[in-house]
Amino acid sequence: MTDTLSRLAEVLESRKDAAADSSYVASLYHKGLNKILEKLGEESIETIIAAKDAAVSGDCSDVIYETADLWFHSMVMLAALGQHPQAVLDELDRRFGLSGHAEKAARTAE
C-alpha cells in the first residue's frame, strides 16, 4: 500500500476514540455509519458530476479533487466497519489476470 494510504489509514484509526469535536473524522464516527454513508453518497454524486463536466471542458482538476474526497470517505467507511484499505488493495491484486467477465460470473455463481 502506498505511504499516503497507510498514513491516512493510521490517522483514521486514531480518530475513532477521539472526542467528536476534535476533528472532522471523529465527528463522523460519533454520528455513526448512516452519516458516513450519507457523506459517501454525496461524494459519489459530486464525483460523477465533476466527471461529466470534465468530459465537456477537458479540465479534470475537479474530478481529481472529488475523487480524493470519495476515496477519503470510502476509507472512513471501511475504518468504521473495522476494515483496513489493504483489504481493498488485496482484492484488486486478486483480480489481476482475471477477465472482468470471468470475475463477474464468479460473483454471480456464489
Curated annotation (Swiss-Prot):
Localization annotation: Cytoplasm
Gene Ontology CC terms: cytoplasm
Keyword terms: Amino-acid biosynthesis, ATP-binding, Cytoplasm, Histidine biosynthesis, Hydrolase, Nucleotide-binding
GO biological process assignments: L-histidine biosynthetic process
Enzyme Commission code: 3.6.1.31
Reactions catalysed, as given in the entry: 1-(5-phospho-beta-D-ribosyl)-ATP + H2O = 1-(5-phospho-beta-D-ribosyl)-5'-AMP + diphosphate + H(+)
Protein's UniProt keywords contain Nucleus: no
Top-tier EC class: hydrolase
Xref: InterPro entries: HisE, PRib-ATP_PPHydrolase-like
Main location (coarse class): cytoplasm
One Gene Ontology term of the molecular function aspect: phosphoribosyl-ATP diphosphatase activity
Pathway in which this enzyme or protein is active: Amino-acid biosynthesis; L-histidine biosynthesis; L-histidine from 5-phospho-alpha-D-ribose 1-diphosphate: step 2/9
Gene3D superfamilies in UniProt: MazG-like
PANTHER family: HISTIDINE BIOSYNTHESIS BIFUNCTIONAL PROTEIN, HISTIDINE BIOSYNTHESIS BIFUNCTIONAL PROTEIN HISIE
Cited HAMAP family: HisE (MF_01020)
Family: Belongs to the PRA-PH family.
Designated name of the protein: Phosphoribosyl-ATP pyrophosphatase
Organism: Pseudomonas savastanoi pv. phaseolicola (strain 1448A / Race 6) (Pseudomonas syringae pv. phaseolicola (strain 1448A / Race 6))
Gene, per the UniProt record: hisE
